[in-house]
């Protein structure tokens, strides 16, 4: 990807399934300024008296210049233009845990925030997904014998890793650094990825990184620990700890979770709640096939936070696969009625994360929304953070 350092802001959203694209050319700083636009199959060029902006498209995306249509001027945005594209649908979603390659390997679990080793050289023989929350009902409906696993939680053995919607379940060994607090478990309904254990809230069940003091997960029993995907990086032991900016990691993990769940369960609405049980965000997936290409993203008008500065620096002239979602914040008593309605709707899935991570995610969504052209930021009463990336940037 390449873009000139000066010129007009160019925003291009490519929809792979629809083979179409929306092009937004930002308003010039001075009204009435002339603008020359050149569109070729592999590039976009915008010339103004201030300078030239050029985008080189990724190899898998080609524009159809003759299909340009729907030209209109939107105050605050600039020019909107639609055109057809030829885009390969080769954006494969990388699983949160590559079962085929990482099973049978010695892996090390790191704290994503600081790189502290949480579990060292653990050989994972079985890497298995936990069943969905409805599996118990399906067994009763389709099987002629009683469910032998009713009300029995699934405890991973020493070399197991069970994968939930937003967490890993691993078995604690005596040589693990994490202390084992006393627990107060209550009766379990059915072991599942969403409702695997019911515990009375107790401060000493938290798993805390001893270096940076970030909450990594929760101790579920004397041997079983839940580690949240947003807080942990699992690597083969022969590899070094990968340094990934925090905001990039969080939105990538959450977007992967959302896409996998929406594909597996045909659900597109989610509540994001903290480990304290409070709902922080309502999310509604619009699509997951977008490729966003942008140049000259201005961050002057965006309030900067240390969590996001790494992304603000790297976003000029970039392309990335994205999940487009609608969201509503539910903090400080906002959207209480809507949140209650969503919580009581059985078709809406819940994701549980550490409460601090929920606030990080809300900040990321707000920042992503603020970088969109103004006319694309809202749909009805929801906000639209389109650049919710789920894979590495496209180069």
PLM regions with names:
Residues 1-395:
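N-terminal pre-domain and mature-chain start segments
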């Amino acid at each position: 990807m390449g873009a000139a350092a000066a010129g007009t802001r160019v925003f291009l959203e490519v929809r792979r399934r629809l083979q179409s694209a929306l092009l937004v050319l930002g308003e010039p700083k001075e009204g009435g300024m002339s603008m020359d636009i050149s569109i070729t199959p592999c590039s976009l060029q915008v010339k103004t008296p201030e300078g030239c902006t050029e985008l080189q498209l990724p190899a898998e995306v080609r524009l159809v210049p003759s299909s340009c249509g729907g030209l209109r001027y939107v105050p605050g945005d600039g020019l909107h233009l639609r055109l057809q594209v030829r885009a390969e649908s080769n954006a494969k979603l990388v699983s949160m845990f590559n079962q085929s390659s990482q099973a049978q390997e010695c892996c090390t679990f790191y704290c994503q925030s600081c790189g502290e080793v949480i579990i060292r050289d653990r050989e994972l023989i079985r890497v298995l997904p936990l069943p969905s929350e409805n599996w118990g009902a399906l067994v009763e409906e389709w099987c002629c014998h009683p469910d032998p696993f009713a009300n029995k939680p699934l405890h991973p053995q020493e070399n197991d890793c069970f994968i939930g919607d937003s967490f890993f379940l691993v078995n604690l060994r005596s040589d693990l650094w994490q202390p084992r607090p006393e627990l107060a478990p209550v009766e379990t309904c059915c072991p599942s990825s969403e409702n695997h254990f019911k515990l009375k809230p107790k401060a000493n069940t938290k798993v805390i990184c001893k270096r940076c003091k970030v909450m990594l997960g929760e101790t579920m029993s004397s041997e079983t620990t839940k580690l949240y995907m947003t807080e942990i990086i699992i690597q083969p032991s022969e590899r070094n700890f990968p340094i990934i900016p925090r905001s990039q990691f969080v939105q990538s993990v959450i977007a992967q979770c959302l896409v996998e769940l929406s594909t597996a369960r045909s659900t597109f609405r989610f509540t994001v709640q903290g480990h304290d049980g409070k709902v922080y965000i309502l999310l509604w997936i619009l699509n997951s096939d977008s490729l966003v290409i942008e140049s000259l993203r201005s961050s002057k008008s965006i309030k900067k936070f240390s969590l996001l500065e790494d992304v603000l620096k790297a976003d000029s002239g970039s392309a990335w696969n994205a999940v487009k979602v609608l969201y509503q914040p539910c903090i400080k008593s906002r959207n209480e009625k809507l949140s209650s309605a969503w919580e009581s709707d059985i078709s809406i899935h819940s994701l549980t994360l550490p409460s601090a991570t929920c606030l990080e995610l809300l900040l990321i969504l707000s920042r992503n929304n603020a970088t969109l052209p103004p006319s694309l930021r809202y749909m009805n009463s929801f906000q639209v953070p389109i650049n919710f990336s789920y894979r590495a940037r496209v180069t």
